[in-house]
């Protein structure tokens, strides 16, 4: 797949490395991707949440840390933004031939178009439907 220009521009401003980390989203059936600098922010947030939850949900921190730092893969990209999503990540998010990329501030999400279309968030579903309709019209 080809990363949209807004993702390439953001990654280019934030890091010299032509790559990012990709893993499973915390609560949605998609992938979340971010540069190594953002991984430090995620670590700080995880530590804050661990301290807040340690008395009531001690297992939550271990699960979160595995998801954020253990079940991730590094993906590189070229000047044209071409990437190859690792097979495990594609499978995890049920991504086929095309994907939807959604910016979320410090990170971005990569969705299966069909999964996004069926999501309860109406804005996400509308965007996915648009791209699916565009695909069928071509």
Model-derived features: where do they sit?
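Extended macromolecule-engaging scaffold surfaces
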Residues: 1-18, 40, 49-50
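Short, Lys/Arg-rich amphipathic alpha-helical interaction segments
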Residues: 114-138
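Short, charged/polar, Gly/Pro-enriched secondary-structure boundary elements
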Residues: 10, 39-42, 116-120
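Beta-rich strand-turn-strand
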Residues: 73-96
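Short, structured motif recognition centered on aromatic/hydrophobic residues
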Residues: 1-3, 7, 33, 81-85, ...
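Extended intrinsically disordered, low-complexity coil regions enriched in Ser, Thr, Gly, Ala
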Residues: 9-26, 88-108
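Short, basic amphipathic alpha-helical segments that act as recognition/interaction helices
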Residues: 24-39, 107-116
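Helix-adjacent hinge/juxtasegments
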Residues: 32-69
